Amino acid sequence: MKHIVKNIHFVGIGGAGMSGIAEVLLNLGYKVSGSDVGSNAATRRLASLGATVMHGHDAANIAGANAVVVSTAVSGDNPEVLAARSKRIPVVPRAVMLAELMRLKQGVAIAGTHGKTTTTSLVASVLAEGGLDPTFVIGGRLNSAGANARLGTGDFIVAEADESDASFLNLFPVIEVITNIDADHMDTYGHDFARLKQAFIEFTQRLPFYGIAVLCVDDPNVREILPFVSKPVVRYGFAEDAQIRAVNARAVDGQMHFTVLRHLNGHAEPPLDVVLNLPGLHNVQNALAAIAIATELEVPDAAIVKALREFHGVGRRFQRYGEVATADGTGTFTLVDDYGHHPVEMAATLSAARGAFPGRRLVLAFQPHRFTRTRDCFEDFVKVLGTVDALLLAEVYAAGEAPIVAADGRALTRALRVAAKVEPVFVEQMEEMPQAIMNAARPGDVVVTMGAGSIGAVPGQVVSHQQPLQAGGAA
């Protein structure tokens, strides 16, 4: 970036995507400041690294800034944004700043409706094990690194490419992954699925002539756009025509064992026997994307196998909190947390839980995310929520949206009771959810907390406060 830009301010610095970029810029030697409405692990980490973090938004916060970075979650009437515009300080969208970072390295961009964070983390881990020391910016905390971003000394930067606001079209990577294409964030695309698919086609057109599009051909919508991708393609998945193909996949003690058949550049690579330290067939697909990239970049097979076997996961992606004592003290239940908030990814995670813990009762504590998504996917939510053995259902996490009639937690509860697949317990306040979990959990249960909103704090509360919690509370 130009030498005149020395001080960079982030509005909403605690967000997953924003904090990662801020950390990389700190490590590059820039002076970084930022504001957010509250404190979280990301803001505390950035402060410990030297960033100036302010709580609350105020025009005075941008003093001395040469550029102000904003995400789509920041409204145009934010006082810091208004002050920056009045002072003619550049207001830079998060994706544009990420694109600038990609110009410093060779970009590997991971796109898709589901699986971006896990796939990005797997790619970064495999490349790191292969000695390529990548820079990475991830939407979740990579447990092995203790952070969601890192400045590496190697040539590559691995980052998520966000289709939710079409901002991935700002990026110009040399390698792209598309994990899947599903109907989500449809407001961005005028509720026109064809426009969403066209955006992914345009994303592949950002590649240079020597670039590679790594595409999951198990997904019917990815397969549908395949004829319109003009750049070199590597197909991965379980499908017979996949060039990076998994066969004989099976769940063993919470891990996935499978063999990878590889046919690239006109010849077959030796089969690769893999143990992935994650559950679920969807994570096998995510790992195949990492294997495809690693094989293209000539990472040794031994490094690929080691990275996947020793993968420590990502925060809030099937994150295991271990065993928790039941309220009556007669046994324990297993507590798992996941970020899933779309019916497709929820179904994949619940299937993975069944595979990882066969024969055990599955209890789901779910907080829907956004009223628009609840409205648009209402019947699919009812279907997937009806597959669990017991359900605790919270009110929708609004994420800034106004309520929509018949698209809230109570409406889902009523629909589930009519469907008669599971008897849901509606938990009106999130503060009541830890107690509701303790009330519901029996010895031997697997309890999964799920959602992209405030429910992410609940597992820690259950673990840290399990002693004071007794039977009773929310019904």
UniProtKB/Swiss-Prot annotation:
InterPro entries: Mur-like_cat_sf (IPR036565), Mur_ligase_C (IPR004101), Mur_ligase_C_dom_sf (IPR036615), Mur_ligase_cen (IPR013221), Mur_ligase_N (IPR000713), MurCDEF_pg_biosynth (IPR050061), UDP-N-AcMur_Ala_ligase_MurC (IPR005758). Its main location: cytoplasm. Keywords: ATP-binding, Cell cycle, Cell division, Cell shape, Cell wall biogenesis/degradation, Cytoplasm, Ligase, Nucleotide-binding, Peptidoglycan synthesis. ATP binds at residues 112-118. GO terms for molecular function: ATP binding; UDP-N-acetylmuramate-L-alanine ligase activity. Its EC number is 6.3.2.8. It is an enzyme of class 6 (ligase). It catalyses: UDP-N-acetyl-alpha-D-muramate + L-alanine + ATP = UDP-N-acetyl-alpha-D-muramoyl-L-alanine + ADP + phosphate + H(+). One of its GO terms (cellular component) is cytoplasm. GO terms for biological process: cell division; cell wall organization; peptidoglycan biosynthetic process; regulation of cell shape. Pathway: Cell wall biogenesis; peptidoglycan biosynthesis. The keyword Cell division applies. It is found in: Cytoplasm. Gene3D superfamilies: Mur ligase, C-terminal domain, Mur-like, catalytic domain, NAD(P)-binding Rossmann-like Domain. PANTHER family: UDP-N-ACETYLMURAMATE--L-ALANINE LIGASE, UDP-N-ACETYLMURAMATE--L-ALANINE LIGASE-RELATED. Cell wall formation. Belongs to the MurCDEF family. This is UDP-N-acetylmuramate--L-alanine ligase. It comes from Cupriavidus pinatubonensis (strain JMP 134 / LMG 1197) (Cupriavidus necator (strain JMP 134)).
